[in-house]
Amino acid sequence: AVAGLVAVTPAAGYAGPMGAIVLGLVVGVVCLFFCTVVKNSLGYDDSLDVFGIHGVGGIVGALGTGILVNPALGGAGVMDYTVGKIADYDFAAQMISQLWGVGVTVLFSGIGSAILFKVVDVIVGLRVPVDAEREGLDITDHTERAYNM
């Protein structure tokens, strides 16, 4: 459900109802695949699947918006603000614009995150010690248990 909401957010004002349903179904499968197969094969630590749901879902949603904006598919069309009316839909031009937007966003976020990760790593470190993680952070950081099991 969250993956569908993430994907339909960029398309909210442009996609028709059926297009939004199809986008949600497609992104659900893509995000499930990414959160299981890709995450396990790459071996990165994402316990809440934040990147698999929000990152991948947002990318698929942004690209899907370029498809679903087509009036022939029930979309709202692309507004041409220079003449003040709906412009003719050009799939190739729209997808190039969507790809540029996604690419710039991924680069900006990736570079900014890398800088911030390095700053945090230098100041306090990115991970807790292995023994503290094995013992449980509730005990090592808060000196109490969160769950009595």
List where the protein language model places each region:
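Glycine- and aromatic-enriched membrane alpha-helices
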Residues: A1-M149
